[in-house]
A protein has these predicted regions:
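Alpha-helical assembly-interface signal, strongest on the long, hydrophobic N-terminal helix that forms
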Residues: 2-71
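Short, conserved structural patches
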Residues: 55-134
């Protein structure tokens, strides 16, 4: 009788240990995967916006409102708020064949339960070539 009771208690302890392992080890991994997926989504959206911005800036040969608007439209299409993203275009004017760089920077907060929390800076840049002669 005591042996049967002891085995039942031991099975209960094993079940509790399994639940704790899942809760404290596998859940942070799951949350980490979800957080990393969100960061990759943001980065891909920024890459797309920088590429479009470099293309439009190269076509126009300068940094102007049309370039900024096109980058904002692309960021919005990716689900990002253009107000929270820094866009730089350098140099402001280019001639035929000269490089023009569009850089998109945003700050994100990464938090994985039970592990860590930190602020990250995501940066994307693309280089286009001037297609007009000023």
């Amino acid at each position: 009788m005591r042996g049967v009771r002891r085995r039942r208690l031991q099975r209960g302890q094993e079940t509790l240990q399994a639940v704790l392992v899942v809760a404290f080890m596998l859940l942070p991994v799951l949350f980490g995967i979800v957080e990393l997926g969100g960061l990759i989504h943001v980065w891909i959206g920024q890459q797309s916006a920088a590429a479009i911005g470099a293309r439009v800036a190269g076509e126009r040969g300068e940094d102007d409102a049309i370039v900024r608007d096109r980058v904002a439209v692309e960021l919005h299409a990716a689900g990002l708020d253009p107000a929270h993203v820094q866009v730089t275009v350098s140099p402001p004017y280019v001639r035929w064949g000269q490089p023009i760089t569009v850089r998109v920077i945003s700050r994100r907060h990464l938090a994985i339960p039970f592990l860590f929390s930190r602020d990250l800076t995501l940066a994307s840049s693309y280089v286009g070539r001037g297609e007009v002669n000023h």
